């Protein structure tokens, strides 16, 4: 009798490197039209781009107004949202080409040397400091119609409402000349890193083929390689959040540096659905704590759980706050494995310095790859490991 390999039994057989003929499995997109993405599972989403805002330069009153305005929108927004904060090294190609033209046309040797030194400085800053930040909110279609016209009308209303509330609290949204091309270019940034800097002029007829990476290696435990770009995926564990956080607690994730993408999944639960669960949990933990000695370690855990339940119930009933589940995922990208590991360590340390516990999605990198796409689709296993309840 042949004895099976224990590693294969526990972890499964090694995944094969995905080549150009099979990478369509990484593209859950069926079509893009009318500013809407249709997914393979029949769902529809759209993406709203929001311009960056330096929150720290605002006065205390302005900061509170921004937070309260955003919270007001969350009360009437779709019950499920995805917020994407993407940072990339600044694109300096056009500027460098202009400097090169100046350099070639300059006759004075001293001026040529100054232009060359400027080019070196710009290149250094771009590699080490300069980044571009882009923010997106992914909105779902929550209606029940199968008619595309009705879907478009409802999605348009959802986007317009979001624009109205966000701009009322000081956040400027972007209206693109062609929303379909914007969505296609956005997805290319996640699925086709080799096309970075190439501006599409139209939507390809076969959208899945156009979005399919030329190569994708998902065989590694702790990273992936897509068209030569190395990526590692992290998540904040469910118990890895501090008990309380101040204003703009998530801002450092968006400022972590080039090659870092932070994704936040939000799911609102109705009061009618969540209040009974919170009450039952408090009653259950109260009955358990009576059987536990106050010197045992789990006594403190039960006492904290009871206090948290009572606090949430009070805030929901008396302060009008909403109950949400949040999942925080991050991807780290680099041109080589050494830089990837360095950036990954820096990101984990950043999270730890703020009281968060970041874990790498080992043996789930392929699932994390799909969960980071701006399509409001998170893997069930990753969602379970990273889900945390919060209040607005």
Regions found by a protein language model. Name each.
Residues 2-392:
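Extended, folded cores of ATP/NTP-driven motor/assembly subunits in large transport
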């Amino acid at each position: 009798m042949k004895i099976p390999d224990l590693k294969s039994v526990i972890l499964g057989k090694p995944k094969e490197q995905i080549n150009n003929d099979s990478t369509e499995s990484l593209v859950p997109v069926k079509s893009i039209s009318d500013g809407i993405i249709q997914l393979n599972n029949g769902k529809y989403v759209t993406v709203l781009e929001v311009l960056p805002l330096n929150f720290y330069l605002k006065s205390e009153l302005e900061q509170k107004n921004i937070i309260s305005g955003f919270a007001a929108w969350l009360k009437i927004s779709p019950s499920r949202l995805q917020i994407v904060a993407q940072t990339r090294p600044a694109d300096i190609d056009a500027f460098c080409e202009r400097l090169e033209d100046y350099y070639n046309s300059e006759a004075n040797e001293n001026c040529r040397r100054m232009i060359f030194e400027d080019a070196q400085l710009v290149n250094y800053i771009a590699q080490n400091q300069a980044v571009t930040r882009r923010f997106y909110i992914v909105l779902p279609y929550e209606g029940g119609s199968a008619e595309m016209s009705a879907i478009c009308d409802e999605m348009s209303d959802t986007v317009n409402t979001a624009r109205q509330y966000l701009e009322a609290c000081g956040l400027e949204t972007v209206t693109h000349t062609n929303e379909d091309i914007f969505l296609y270019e956005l997805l290319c940034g996640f699925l086709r890193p080799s096309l970075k800097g190439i501006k599409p002029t139209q939507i390809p007829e076969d959208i899945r083929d156009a979005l399919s990476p030329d190569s994708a290696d998902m065989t590694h435990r702790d990273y992936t390689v897509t068209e030569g770009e190395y990526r590692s995926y992290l998540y904040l564990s469910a118990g890895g959040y501090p008990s309380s956080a101040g204003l703009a607690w998530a801002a450092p994730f968006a400022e972590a540096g080039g090659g870092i993408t932070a994704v936040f999944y939000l799911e609102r639960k109705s009061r009618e659905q969540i209040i009974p669960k919170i009450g039952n949990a408090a009653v259950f933990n109260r009955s358990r704590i009576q059987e536990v000695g106050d010197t045992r370690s789990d006594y403190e855990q039960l006492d904290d759980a009871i206090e948290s339940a009572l606090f949430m119930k009070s805030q929901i009933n008396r302060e009008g706050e909403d109950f949400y589940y949040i999942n925080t995922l991050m991807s780290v990208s680099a041109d080589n494995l050494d830089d990837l590991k360095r950036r990954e360590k820096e990101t984990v340390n950043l999270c730890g310095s703020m009281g968060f516990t970041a874990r790498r999605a080992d043996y789930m990198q392929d699932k994390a790859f799909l969960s980071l796409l701006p399509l409001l689709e998170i893997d069930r296993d990753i969602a379970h490991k990273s889900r945390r309840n919060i209040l607005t």
